[in-house]
C-alpha cells in the first residue's frame, strides 16, 4: 500500500504527551497514530517504534525523543513523546520540541502522581499555552465516583498552576483498548474525542511571519557612502524599507530607519521571518550597534536584566560541570548571539545545584537583553555550555 502523503495545506500544530511514568503516554501516542491513520491517512506507529526513541542533541544536551505525525479533519499534527522523565525536563527547557499544546496523560487507576505535578509546573514555567487531559486506563476503574474524584483532582492541580482547570477538556478512555482495535466508547471513540478536543481547544498558532518584527544582530559592517549594514536571520515578522525600527539591548534603546534590505546581494523592498538579510540603517554609526542586540518593531520588546528561569544543568556525561555550584554563581548567559555575565540566586531550600539537576532560579544580568517570557538561553563557562534555560518571569 502506498503511504498517504500529508497535504501541507492544513494548518500545522505541535503537540506532545506529558505525564507520570507508566501512565500510558507512549501507548496513547501509538493509539492516536493507529486510529487516525485509518480515518485520515498517514502512518500508524507501533508502541515499540515509538518507545525506541532515537537520541538527539539540542544545544549539546542529549535527549531521547520520538516524533510522530498524524492528521485530523482540519489539521496536521507533529507530536513528541519522550521515554524518560529526564528527557521531558530537557526537552521542555531547551525548547527542542516546541509545544503549542500538551496532552497530559493521567492513569484513572492511580490519579495524579509526582511527575504529573512536575510536568504541569514545567509546562507553566516554559510557556506551554494549553493542556488537554486524557484520563487513561478508564477501563480498569469500575466505580464512576472514583473516576469523578480523579477528574476533580486533576482539575484542581491544573488550576493550582494557573491553567484553567474547570474548562480543560478531559477525555476518558483506554489507549490500550484503542490500540487493540476496540471500537467502543473507551477505545477508538475516546481517541476520536481527543482528536476533536485538540482541534477545538488549541488555537492555530500564529505563524512567525505574522509576529512583530525581530532580528538578532549577528554582524555589523560599515559600507562607505551607504552607511551601516546589520546582518542576521529575521526571527519573526516583516521589515519594509522606510520603516522605523528600534535597536534594543545592551545599550540604551535607539530608533533608526531601515533604508534597505539585501539578500543574496539583491536589494529587496522587504525581508521576512526566516530570511538571512543585511539591513541598511539610516544615520546609525557602526559603533552604535553590536552583536547581541536585536532590531525590532518599535515598542514590541524591551531590555531587561532581572528574571526567574527554569534551568537544566548538564550532567558530567553531557560535557557539563563535574562539581555543583552554589548561590551567587556567576556564569555567562548566552542569549541569541552573545554572552552576558549574570549572577544566580537560588531558591531558599536549595543550597547547591548538582550536574544533571533542573532548578528554578533568579538571574541578574550585568547588561540588559531584549527579552520576553519564553526566551531560551544557554549557560556557559568559558565558551563551554553547562546549562540550558528558559525565561519564566521577567522581574525588571
From Swiss-Prot:
Residue numbers binding GTP: 19-26, 81-85, 136-139
Gene3D superfamilies documented for this protein: P-loop containing nucleotide triphosphate hydrolases, Translation factors
Annotated spans, G1: 19-26
Pfam families on file: GTP_EFTU, GTP_EFTU_D2, GTP_EFTU_D3
Domain of life where this protein originates: Bacteria
Region of interest: G4: 136-139
Annotated residues for binding of Mg(2+): 26
Subcellular location: Cytoplasm
Annotated segments matching region G5: 174-176
Span list, region G3: 81-84
Record-annotated tr-type G domain positions: 10-206
Catalytic reactions on record: GTP + H2O = GDP + phosphate + H(+)
Keywords: Cytoplasm, Elongation factor, GTP-binding, Hydrolase, Magnesium, Metal-binding, Nucleotide-binding, Protein biosynthesis
Chain spans, region G2: 60-64
EC main group: hydrolase
Chain ranges passing through the membrane: none
Key word GTP-binding present: yes
Family: Belongs to the TRAFAC class translation factor GTPase superfamily. Classic translation factor GTPase family. EF-Tu/EF-1A subfamily.
Record's subunit section: Monomer.
Protein name, UniProt field: Elongation factor Tu
